[in-house]
A protein has these predicted regions:
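GST-like fold's C-terminal all-alpha helical module
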Residues: 94-193
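GST-like domain detector, emphasizing the conserved glutathione-binding G-site
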Residues: 1-124, 176
Length: 193
């Protein structure tokens, strides 16, 4: 989700980076001590400092490399862009997790992929890690986030309405805020990654 958002931005901005597939050992022994959490994306800068959380990461990277910036200069447009980014990051998370972890074909594919990635080079079995991640993601990010059979239709409708509005907005422009990508485009991309 957020790794896709960050990687899309890094590619767009032409920022040299090395994408590292993490396993449980890297998460535990490197990422956790450096960031305080066992989550990706996380990025180590050339000066040794670590960054986490895509919103502040992209703000910092944009200040260092952003020519042109992905943030609107006009204060009102800037505020709206941040508001819409927050919506895409925080509200479209639910439908994204719902579609990834609520359906057998989706969670089967993802549990196999995550099991392979997280166990690669470790002593842990891929199948076990895959099943762990499947249930962790479902229980934490679907069920515990409030998605239940009685409100699945609302989650589906939220995503459908959002896609319809994006399609309408993009009929006369290549990007959501105009002629070039902005933070808004990258935020919406996360839920579709």
């Amino acid at each position: 989700y957020y790794s896709g958002k960050l990687e899309a931005y890094l590619r767009y901005a032409g920022i040299d980076h090395e994408r590292i597939e993490v396993n449980t050992d890297i998460l535990r022994d490197t990422v956790l001590p450096a960031t305080g959490v066992m989550k990706v994306p996380a990025m180590q800068c050339p000066d040794g400092r670590w960054l986490k959380d895509t919103t502040p990461m992209m703000r910092w990277l944009d200040q260092q490399h952003g020519k042109p910036s992905i943030y609107p200069r006009d204060p009102a447009s800037h505020f709206i862009a941040l508001l819409v980014e927050d919506y895409a990051d925080e509200w479209l998370w639910r439908p994204a997790m719902y579609y990834r972890w609520n359906f057998a074909d989706s969670h089967r594919l993802l549990r196999h992929r995550l099991g392979r990635e997280l166990s690669d080079g470790t002593r842990y079995p891929a199948a076990g890690l895959g099943w762990f991640m499947r249930w962790r993601q479902y229980l934490t990010f679907v069920r515990d986030d409030g998605i239940r059979p009685h409100n699945e239709a609302q989650v589906q409708a939220l995503y459908g309405r959002t896609l319809a509005q994006l399609s309408q907005r993009l009929q006369d422009r290549p990007f959501l805020l105009g002629e070039r990508p902005s933070i808004v485009d990258f935020a919406f991309f996360a839920s579709m990654f």
